[in-house]
């Protein structure tokens, strides 16, 4: 009887998979909104930090990035500020976009059962405060906020194990046909972009679909 009840409850759990790269301002916006939706609708978020450059190359997207297209970048900065104002959060561009080290840190936070907190802290530092993701002191700042052993965290993000896990998750994302960030999945349904979150909200509000 207890087993049946547990299986029934498991089927009611709604899980949204969230693929992101800390270099992405649109992922920062999406993370903020997705966290609010998770509170409102009671679903769980499964986080995946991936290498956006590798994902784009995998589908043949080898053109210049938005950062290299000055006219487009000028517009995107305006658009991003509009979204930030809508969400009532700050948005400050960092000095660079070298996100690999902090991306790998997600897989340390998983062992600490603090993935959501880690993602929020790093996004707020990089895009809320404009701190460069490769700033030498950023791991110490994150460790302090989360109550972690700084040395253990720094050792992990410099380890081969962290790189292997990061590469594995990026490859798995490519296999799942992820081509950009932010990308969200509810079951087999995929949405790409911060501006598609209203569609995800409609889906979450209408069906008890688990993410397995």
UniProtKB/Swiss-Prot annotation:
Keyword check for Isomerase: yes
Cofactors: glutathione
Pfam families: DSBA
GO biological process, alphabetically ordered: glutathione metabolic process; naphthalene catabolic process
First-tier enzyme category under EC: isomerase
Highest taxon listed in the record's lineage: Bacteria
Keywords assigned by UniProt, alphabetized: Aromatic hydrocarbons catabolism, Isomerase, Plasmid
Disulfide cross-links: none
Known pathway: Aromatic compound metabolism; naphthalene degradation
Sites where the protein binds glutathione: 24, 181, 192-195
Positions bound to substrate: 56, 66-67, 97
Gene3D superfamilies assigned to the protein according to its UniProt record, in alphabetical order: Glutaredoxin
The EC number(s) this enzyme carries: 5.99.1.4
GO molecular function: 2-hydroxychromene-2-carboxylate isomerase activity; glutathione peroxidase activity; glutathione transferase activity
Catalytic site positions: 24 (nucleophile)
Family matches, as CDD domains: DsbA_HCCA_Iso (cd03022)
Chain's role: Involved in the naphthalene catabolic pathway. Catalyzes the reversible glutathione-dependent isomerization of 2-hydroxychromene-2-carboxylate (HCCA) to trans-O-hydroxybenzylidenepyruvate (THBPA).
Family: Belongs to the GST superfamily. NadH family.
Protein name (Swiss-Prot/TrEMBL): 2-hydroxychromene-2-carboxylate isomerase
Organism of provenance: Pseudomonas sp. (strain C18)
């Amino acid at each position: 009887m207890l087993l049946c009840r547990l299986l029934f409850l498991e089927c009611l759990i709604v899980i949204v998979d969230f693929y992101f790269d800390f270099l992405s301002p649109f992922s920062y916006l999406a993370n903020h909104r997705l966290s609010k939706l998770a509170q409102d609708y009671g679903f769980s978020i499964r986080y995946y930090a991936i290498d956006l450059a590798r994902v784009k190359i995998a589908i043949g997207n080898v053109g210049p990035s938005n950062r290299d297209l000055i006219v487009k970048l000028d517009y995107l900065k305006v658009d991003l500020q509009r979204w930030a104002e809508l969400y009532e959060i700050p948005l400050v561009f960092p000095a660079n976009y070298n996100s690999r080290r902090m991306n790998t840190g997600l897989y340390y936070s998983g062992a600490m059962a603090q993935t959501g907190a880690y993602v929020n802290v790093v996004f707020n530092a990089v895009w809320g405060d404009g701190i460069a993701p490769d700033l030498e002191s950023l791991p110490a700042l994150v460790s302090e906020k989360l109550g972690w052993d700084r040395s253990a965290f720094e050792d992990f993000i410099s380890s081969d194990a962290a790189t292997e896990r990061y590469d594995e998750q990026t490859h798995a994302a490519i296999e799942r046909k992820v081509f950009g960030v932010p990308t969200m999945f509810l079951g087999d349904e995929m949405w790409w972009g911060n501006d598609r979150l209203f569609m995800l909200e409609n889906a979450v509000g209408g069906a008890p679909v688990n993410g397995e």
